[in-house]
Curated annotation (Swiss-Prot):
GO terms for molecular function: DNA binding; DNA-binding transcription factor activity; protein dimerization activity. It comes from Avian retrovirus MH2E21. InterPro entries: bHLH_dom (IPR011598), HLH_DNA-bd_sf (IPR036638), Myc-LZ (IPR003327), Myc_transcription_factors (IPR050433), Tscrpt_reg_Myc (IPR002418), Tscrpt_reg_Myc_N (IPR012682). Residues 156-169 have a biased composition (Pro residues). PANTHER family: MYC PROTO-ONCOGENE. Efficient DNA binding requires dimerization with another bHLH protein. CDD domains: bHLHzip_c-Myc. Residues 327-379 form the bHLH domain. This is Viral myc transforming protein. Gene3D superfamilies: Helix-loop-helix DNA-binding domain. Pfam families: HLH, Myc-LZ, Myc_N. The gene is MYC.
Length: 412
């Protein structure tokens, strides 16, 4: 798929003549980008995929961690997880782990990687070129593996974790290689996880041998000076961390200090959430019970409770008024009964004090009151009479005393 680039021309009448197609030729191998750039520098302008790195060039990466290649070496014929990851990274893009704790920093094939250039930034399809390069890499890796088998068996290292594999012939070695390649590819991380975020963090100290991939500064394809700038920027693409009991304490302290200044990326977790979508079916018969969402149901329940309380208050207000009236009436009746009883008892007591009606138990209250009035008046008249009689008796006494005194004086 050719890309066309137009340069600004001073003669505006020939702007459309300045548009020249940009082609990629298939004679070159993995470094065909540099060759295409050198060839097209005289004929046509650079493609947008070549100078786009200059626009998105990031800051230099921090200093790298010390190499742990010696810790990852194993003496068994069955390669470890780190060896499998190294194999896959060498197979799928040259030196994708340039300047990391696994590979040597002098390999610059990551700058010329076909997969990164094509999948991430180029605008054309390079399937045939990719198949060609991958097949060549596969053949070279098979040859190097067959030659390096005895040398790998003589390397010192810890005993193998599993049982030793059976003696491998050509078919068995190919099957073992495919098994190793599948196991290593299963442990890899996709390119969508590799390239969006910068790499500046380390894996957790308790994790096993795992690959944490990320891009700190993208490569630029523009000549030797730009490649030297990339070397100064120290591109760190892959960092492998192996859990060692002796290094767990130091890594935990450094991790605690780095967590404050660097974000922690966790795998994306997709949770299912239920969205309440209620659509009325006009063709369905009307139902007495209507389903509502949880929030509406709570609001309706609360509204119903409030309505019930208000209705209960409205209904209970006459009931409470009637009950209050009944209570008042009952209280009034009780008090009236007590008053009548007291009045009757008082009439009975008054009747007992009047001699004329004292023995008449059926005497009416009016008769009792009349006889009581007459009796009181008679008692008052008797009182006045007795008082006058007492006064007469006192005077008589005085006269008698005076007469007695005169008699005593005459005898003396």
């Amino acid at each position: 798929m050719p890309l066309s680039v137009s340069l600004p021309s001073k003669n505006y009448d020939y702007d459309y003549d300045s548009v020249q197609p940009y082609f990629y030729f298939e004679e070159e191998e993995e470094n065909f980008y540099l060759a295409a750039q050198q060839r097209s520098s005289e004929l046509q302008p650079p493609a947008p995929s070549e100078d786009i790195w200059k626009k998105f060039e990031l800051l230099p990466a921090p200093p790298l961690s010390p190499s742990c290649r010696s810790n990852l070496a194993a003496a068994s014929c069955f390669p470890s997880t780190a060896d499998q990851l190294e194999m896959v990274t060498e197979l799928l893009g040259g030196d994708m782990v340039n300047q990391s704790s696994i590979c040597d920093p002098d390999d610059e094939s990551f700058v010329k990687s076909i997969i990164i250039r094509d999948c991430m930034w180029s605008g054309f399809s390079a399937a045939a070129k990719l198949e060609k390069v991958v097949s060549e890499k596969l053949a070279t890796y098979k040859a190097s593996r067959r030659e390096g088998g005895p040398a790998a068996a003589s390397r010192p290292g810890p005993p193998p974790s599993g049982p030793p594999p059976p003696p491998a012939g050509p078919a068995a070695s190919a099957g073992l290689y495919l098994h190793d390649l599948g196991a290593a590819a299963a442990g890899c991380i996709g390119s969508s996880v590799v390239f969006p975020c910068p790499l500046g963090r380390r894996g957790p100290p308790g994790a096993g041998p795992a690959a944490l991939l990320g891009v700190d500064a993208p490569p630029t394809a523009g000549g030797g000076s730009e490649e030297e700038q990339e070397e100064d920027e120290e591109i760190d693409v892959v960092t492998l961390a192996e859990a060692n009991e002796s290094e767990s304490s130091t890594e935990s302290s450094t991790e605690a200090s780095e967590e404050h200044c660097k974000p922690h990326h966790s795998p994306l977790v997709l949770e299912r959430c239920h969205v309440n979508i209620h659509q009325h079916n006009y063709a369905a018969p009307p139902s007495t019970k209507v389903e509502y969402p949880a929030a509406k149901r709570l609001k309706l329940d609360s509204g119903r409770v409030l309505k019930q309380v208000s209705n209960n208050r409205k209904c209970s207000s006459p009931r409470t008024s009637d009950s209050e009236v009944n209570d008042k009436r009952r209280t009034h009746n009780v008090l009236e009964r007590q008053r009548r009883n007291e009045l009757k008892l008082s009439f009975f007591a008054l009747r007992d004090q009047i001699p004329e009606v004292a023995n008449n138990e059926k005497a009416p209250k009016v008769v009792i009151l009349k006889r009581a009035t007459e009796y009181v008046l008679s008692i008052q008249s008797d009182e006045h009479r007795l008082i006058a009689e007492k006064e007469q008796l006192r005077r008589r006494r005085e006269q008698l005393k005076h007469k007695l005194e005169q008699l005593r004086n005459s005898r003396a």
